[in-house]
Amino acid sequence: MQKSFLLLFFALLPFSLSAQHLFLQLGGGFAGHYNAHRPVGATQVALGYEFELDQHWALAPSFGFAGKGWEEADRLTPDLLYDAAGQPRRNAAGEHLQRTDAQGRPVQSTMHRDYTAHYLQLDLPLHYYHRLAEHRYLRFMAGVYTAYGVGGRRRTRGDGTAAGERKISYTDPTFSLSGSRRFDAGLKAGVAYQFPTALTAGVEANFGLLPVNRLSSDFTKEGRNVSLLLTFTYHFDRKKRISAPADAF
């Protein structure tokens, strides 16, 4: 009974707060590592609450889902031979045999790997509003974030060292790989324009400070997350910041 009461309390808590401060943020863009070969897609969905400190400053914590990822640079791998049972084919010296071309030269395969990583993310940014005109604001944002990885996958294509169909493509859970880290934390900054309606559109960047993977048998280098997002924020009260002080300009 007590657990049910607590669950109901936390479920209804957002509705007990003033609706004018609730907001929903959606974002999409690009993510990678500082040393990644190419960026991949990034997404963000978060529900937040803005605590106004005065007519310019506000604290806006939010909690939601963040999708990140990265790509590794392509690399060559030997095209190894296996028998029908998937066991390595070896020569008299016990060495794993490698496929060769018509001239007897070893054949190599180009291996490509890309990663997705899904996080539950808590943002704690500070907003500064600069009034441009009536009902129109420029919003500057800076703060910190912390996140915990809950899912994702590594997709490998063209791995010549694998057997059977895995030479073509296979996947592994991102956070089950040796050297992977679920915790992520870093800094965030951005700028946005608040329309006279309930919508705010902007750009934000997230800079990871903690390595999310270490050098290991599964990773050739250490990596930290970085992302750039186009964001859209919906405020549940269209009358937000209608009244401005005389010194707002």
Task: List each model region and its residues.
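Sec-dependent N-terminal signal peptides
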Residues: 4-15
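Extracellular/periplasm-exposed beta-strand and loop segments of Gram-negative cell-envelope proteins
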Residues: 32-38, 68-119, 148-184, 188, ...
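Extended, folded domain segments that form the structural surfaces/walls around functional sites
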Residues: 113-131, 138, 150
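Repeated loop/turn-to-beta-strand initiation elements of outer-membrane beta-barrel proteins
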Residues: 22, 56-59, 136-138, 197-203, ...
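Membrane-proximal, glycine/serine-rich, low-complexity loop/turn segments characteristic
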Residues: 137-145, 206, 242-249
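Positively charged n-region of N-terminal signal peptides that target proteins for export
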Residues: 1-4, 19-20
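Short glycine/proline- and aromatic-enriched beta-strand/turn motifs that initiate or cap beta-hairpins
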Residues: 19-50, 233-249
